[in-house]
Amino acid sequence: MKRIIGILFAIIVLVSCNSQKVYSDFDISYSKNGGPSPIYENLLIKANNVHYSFEGQGKKIKKEFKLTNEDLKKLDNVLSQNNFRRIQEDRKKLYDNVTTSINVKKGPNEGSKTDASLVMPNYKTNWDNILNAFQEIINNNVKKQ
């Protein structure tokens, strides 16, 4: 009996640890959260596989889908053309603001940026172009309910 309980416990631990792996094992992440009426939106890309989740405004969406190599190349080009690595963040203190964070873990655009305290004005257009590229991926692959 103890052996069966031990095996069941080990299986439960392994399954629960594996379910969190999707949130740490990614190449590119896009995260939008916060605000007076909080929302939590995550887009995690690992190779061609994408995990999307949205929670807020009375909705809860989770979706897995694939991106083509062309889609990934297009996203990488947008990051490069808009100098993702050179975007400068402002240092203002903001509260109850919806913030967006982008984290690129590999490739020439490797880096992490957030607009939690806004982006410096001369980089605002670049930042908006990058956000639009991620939003286009979401709009093309996730049907909002």
Which residues does each PLM region occupy?
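Mature extracytoplasmic domains of secretory-pathway proteins
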Residues: K62-E89
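Sec-dependent signal peptide recognition
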Residues: K2-L8
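C-terminal motif of bacterial Sec signal peptides marking the signal peptidase cleavage site
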Residues: V15-S16
